[in-house]
Amino acid sequence: MKHLRLLGMESEREALLKAMQDMECVEISSIDVSEEALKSGFAKPDDKALMSAQEASRAYRTALASLDRFAPEKKGMFRKRQGVSRAAFFSAESEENARTAAETINKDTRRLGEIESERTKNEALRATLAPWLTVDVPLGGADGALSVFFGTVGLNVTDDALKALADSLDGLLTWQQASSDRSLRYLLVMCHGSVKERALSALRDLGFSTVSFRGMTGTAKENDKALAENLAALEKERQEIEQRIAGLGGKREALLEASDRAAIALRREEAKSRLVGTDKVFLLEGWLPADHCAALEKALEPFTCAIETREPTEDEYPQVPVQLKNNKLTRPLNMVTEMYSLPAYGTLDPNPLMAPFFILFYGIMMADMGYGLLMMIASVIISKKYRPKGTSGELFSLLGLCGISTFIMGALTGGFFGDFLTQLVAIVSPGTVFALPKLFDPLDDLTMILIGSMALGLVQIITGMAISLIEKCKRKKFLDAFFEEITWWIVFIGIALLALGKGAAVLYVGCALVLLGPIVQGKGWGKLTGVFGSLYNHVTGYFGDILSYTRLMALMLAGSVIAQVFNMLAAMPGNVIAFIIISMLGNAMNFGLNLLGCYVHDLRLQCLEFFNKFYVDGGKPFRPMTLDTEYVDLQ
């Protein structure tokens, strides 16, 4: 990776950034504006253009969400990416059509929100009026000599209590019950104006709570009718708007393209916000892969600019982004590495070393020709038809590679959806014995598979240690390399020789070197007692790591047994059609579980058993300004 610094003309800034974005190889970094720079006139650009780009991107996403709601598209698990030429994609006509459609849809969507708010408010008002529909008295009350109150009391307030209240006011108060529910009585109370205050005080003593109909005139029934008519009008308008939005479903492709265009423009504006400049020039800093320097310089020849590239210093390593550079075989493993953590800049890319182990181990655990065929077919169809990119593309490429390994291991174990063919032939032709040729059987050769699994684990662990040895030698840490890797290899060889009855001399030498290591490395005699504990922990740790690889045998055995059990159950009815249906259902379940289970266990072996021998994580992902699209495929 190279550090890039570029000084260009402000008048060419937009065109230059577009040229860089076409190259898709430059990550633009933020520049801290110092006091000296401010005095020289350098400053960050205003954020108006960035906010405008964010708003445009948000508008298209909102419009698409509305279309998905009111004009849903028939689609399967994956959406096919339409191929679009760059000229058509960036044409002004396409942008104008999409912008008009988005504005119309979003305006109607906002109105739908207003309608929903009004509907909720009106329904709440109708619920408030419902207890008073039998009262033929204006809700606004009365003026002058007559006072009118609408309110509620508890069910414990009896008619006798209300009559006593009226009598205490010399008959100048009367009341009417409008309705009641489980807890309240809804009362209309009328009294002479001269006793209004006394009446209210007495009513409060009974627990009377006033109900206000602010802004309403006329009776409850009249207001309820008006609200019902308004709700009907709102419902009609809502249906018309939804139909209008649904009628714009044909604009979906234009909106999808526009959403991708807006995302590209937004990335460019975000990069622009990291620049500094004056009204005449601008300054850009960032990172680009070393093998793209010449191509970038050629692409920027038409512009008036000065370019400087240099190697990063060691102090800059934590800030240098990391781009994994792999071929078609190892590129799908990027998703595994990125899921764990990118390697620190200046360290080793693990993908080429991990790829053969990951693919082989997955095949060992699945080990079925039928499952392998399904994986390869799914990978080819989805990759060709839907052309997924990014992590999705890597996932289906990895699926195909693991499918090849699964098929090969299935051929070695004679598995095709378990023993599907054996059971099928037995049903079609009773008495006929048929079996696919195989090198070994997961059920009969358990010991061999167990030893083979641990042997493969030992190979991968030693590979990890060898990588660590080479890296330490590159950094001239020869003592660390000898005492932390080579001495342990001597111990392993000694254990193997002892197990074969060849004596313990090599093991004693290895243990002595392990004990000697801290002293030679300058860790002192005081650490000697801790060395014995370290020796024990390392031996048991390595043994535990190797035992972890027995999961290769366990997953192979489990998948094979489950498939055979389903085939056995399917064969019980003795009918070919029933056998095929039941067997395929059972194998589909087994395939789905193993597809995920084998990935998880394979991932664990790489991250915990292999990476911890040499891997240095903490890398920062390389995020260049790109033309990446979500919905269309630029051609």
Summary of predicted features, one role per range:
Residues 1-2, 9-17, 21-28, 293-635:
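Conserved, carboxylate-rich catalytic/transport cores that coordinate ions
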Residues 1-354, 382, 389-392, 396:
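Long, charged N-terminal accessory/stalk domains
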